[in-house]
Design a protein with these regions (language model features):
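Cytochrome P450 catalytic-core helices
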Residues: 253-272, 276-278, 414-431
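N-terminal membrane-proximal hinge/A-helix region immediately C-terminal to the signal-anchor transmembrane segment
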Residues: 1-92, 107, 111-119, 154-155, ...
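Conserved cytochrome P450 K-helix E-x-x-R motif and the immediately C-terminal K′/meander segment
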Residues: 12-33, 316-355, 376
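Conserved cytochrome P450 K-helix/beta-meander segment immediately N-terminal to the heme-binding cysteine loop
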Residues: 367-393
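Cytochrome P450 heme-thiolate monooxygenase catalytic core
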Residues: 2-3, 66-73, 85, 89, ...
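Cytochrome P450 proximal C-terminal region
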Residues: 117, 140, 165-166, 280-282, ...
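Intrinsically disordered, low-complexity terminal tails and inter-domain linkers enriched
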Residues: 277-322, 466-470
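Cytochrome P450 fold signature focused on the C-terminal beta-domain
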Residues: 214-218, 276-283, 313-324, 337-356, ...
Length: 471
């Protein structure tokens, strides 16, 4: 029999301690065994607390399929995209989406990433107090929309970002509410439905235009429209699902990991000094602020002058993260400590066994990268921020599962890591950031593990940034 933690209540089960402090509740479970049975209101689930059992779940994705109480609600927003689709659809969808994240495509996207990083770093004033959670969310949203679409047919960049962000925020609320309440025409539901309608219309019009003129525009949607697996292209509706999925998966990962990295570096000024030395030595002015073309006129609705993109990079090359090994390790360590996907679910598609326990078909299975990454048997001193633990370590071969594992490992891992490293390097090149006294930084385990507002004072590094330059 699978052990159960004490404290379960009639009807509620373990819902009270879970809602009170979800992260502490999760970290309390391994003492009861590698598999633990919990109940959250009407939902019964098995929590996997052991690394090898988790790897088995992720490896055997036909048996432990995408699903469960979280994924069913995510599909309401993201549709049947690569992240949310069942095993039966996954291989086909991956063949369509994989080309959009090849190294040569990511190299093209970095031009947009670098411009948005410069825009952000150039928008602050010396001594200004900024909420970097809000600032990085804006930068990540703009960058993602700009890499998805070269042009927006009937709306502006910020309006599109706002619609995506509204859907992501609303999706968590809708996960927690009974499904029938989401159909009531309340103001929040009307705003959510209107935003999704606008985005579906936007993607449909873009895809229709791209099919009529099938040149490669260098963006993600161009790759999806051109994808052809076995002589069959994606339909407009399928492209829409992939766009929703890519934005949802990338937005919080990029913004959150960069915010947590800045927060951790402010707590460890010795490591922050080493990062600044690295970005200075690597000449991050090639991707950062104060470089030729940084304030060139904007040529399209995205704020990206693509015709002059080469002017912003050294010797006409795309920005890269070469030479930023420590900065990359800092981001990786931030993802370990604060994995965006802190709680994920699968569902058994057939009767099976896990850890010598029988699981019937339809069992909800929970696994948590946050839980595994905080286990001392897997990561010595797991609560300590230590980028050096990644020296000479291949993340995919160890206990790190911040981007998943097995056949469903995140296809956009390199994309997300590259953007986070570019953002972090550009900010660290231009600014000293320190926490505003009296402000508390809170973990917010919602749909992803988000930071609450992180207020920091930005002090200019002399001569390395022109403030107020970004519009």
């Amino acid at each position: 029999m699978i052990p159960r933690p004490p404290g379960g209540l009639p009807l509620l089960g373990h819902l009270v301690p879970f809602l009170r402090d979800p992260l502490a509740f999760l970290r309390s479970l391994p003492r009861y065994g590698g598999l633990v049975q919990i109940r959250l209101g009407p939902v019964s689930a098995v929590v996997v607390c052991d690394l090898e059992l988790t790897r088995h779940v992720l490896r055997e994705d036909r048996v432990f399929d995408k699903g469960g109480f979280l994924f069913e609600r995510v599909r309401d927003f993201a549709g049947n995209g690569l992240v949310t689709c069942p095993h039966a659809d996954h291989r086909r969808q991956r063949r369509y989406v994989q080309p959009a994240f090849r190294a040569d495509r990511i190299a093209r996207y970095t031009e947009v990433m670098a411009r948005e990083a410069r825009r952000l770093a150039g928008s602050w004033n010396d001594g200004q107090e900024v909420d970097i959670t809000a600032e990085l969310s804006l930068a990540a949203g703009r960058s993602l929309v700009s890499t998805l679409f070269t042009r927006l047919p009937f709306t502006g960049l910020q309006e599109t970002v706002d619609d995506f962000v509204l859907l992501i925020g609303g999706s968590y609320r809708r996960m927690l509410l009974p499904h029938r309440l989401n159909r009531i025409p309340l103001p929040a539901n009307r705003r959510y439905d209107a935003a999704r309608t606008r985005l579906v219309r936007l993607v449909d019009e873009v895809v229709t235009a791209y099919r009529a003129d099938p040149e490669d525009r260098g963006d993600l949607v161009s790759t999806l429209v051109a994808a052809d697996a076995g002589g069959q292209a994606l339909s407009n509706a399928e492209v829409t699902d992939q766009v929703m999925t890519i934005f949802a998966a990338g937005f919080d990962t990029i913004a959150n990991s960069t915010v947590w990295a800045l927060h951790l570096l402010a707590q460890h000024p010795d490591i922050a000094d080493r990062v600044r030395a690295e970005v200075d030595a690597a000449r991050v002015d090639a991707v950062g602020v104060n470089v030729p073309g940084a304030n060139a006129p904007e040529a399209d609705a995205l704020g990206v002058d693509r015709a002059e993109a080469g002017a912003t990079t050294a010797a006409g090359t795309s920005p890269s993260v070469d030479g930023l090994e420590l900065t990359t390790r800092v981001v990786r360590e931030a993802v370990r400590l604060y994995s965006p996907g802190w709680l994920l679910t699968r569902v058994t598609s057939t009767d099976t066994e896990l850890g010598a326990h029988r699981l019937p078909e339809g069992t909800s299975v929970i696994y948590s990268p946050y839980l595994l990454h905080r286990q001392p048997a897997l990561f010595p001193e797991p609560d300590r921020f230590d980028p050096e633990r990644w020296v000479g370590v291949h993340p995919q071969r160890g206990p790190f599962i911040g981007f998943g594992a097995g056949p469903r490992r995140c296809v956009g891992e390199q994309f997300g890591m590259t953007e986070s490293v570019l953002l972090l390097a550009t900010i660290m090149r231009a600014w000293h950031l320190e926490h505003v006294p009296g402000r508390t930084v809170r973990e917010m385990p919602l749909a992803t593990l988000r930071p609450g507002p992180v207020w920091m004072r930005a002090t200019r590094r002399d001569g390395l940034v022109r403030t107020g330059a970004a519009g």
